[in-house]
Amino acid sequence: LKPDATHYCELVFDVNSAYFDNHGGYEFAKQFYADAYKAAVQIVGGEQYILSAVMHADEINRAMTEALGREVYHYHLHVVYVPVVEKQILWSKRCKDKALVGTVKETVMQVSRSKKWASKPLLDDAGKPILQKNGKPVLKKSYSILQDNFFNFMRAAGYTDIERGERGSTEEHLTVTQFKVQ
């Protein structure tokens, strides 16, 4: 690994507190996040890459607590994982057998956050990339792809009333310190 490489990443699965409160609270949240963990396993490429997964109920939703006159907790799941991707090593032009040059020599697993979360080209109805005026493909942000994958997994797991986060949102991720300052 390069000295400045990212060795691990974190996914935070967060759902509106009202969703859990309307479905029974803590027990429902536990089952939901057990299923969300299965989605995380699929998203990161396997359970062997997950270092930690913890459901938190350590925050009170103040607005709902005041409105309902009882404590309503905010549940979320933190998943810490190693961002591993498959990388193909090709035979170089120094190979003695010229027929092998450019073909796959071996496939290795590589730690790479940038390759794990690369943006993907948007496709039209025919499956072809949508192009910008300069001829380059329009890219769908990797976090949008992640949200789509999570949403689709949870719908397939039976959570048919769940709603996907706002598409095209320009909201930025905040560190814990930035969030607390706000």
Locations of the language-model features?
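Single-stranded nucleic-acid nicking/binding segments centered on His-rich, glycine/basic loops
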Residues: R62-A63, V85-Q182
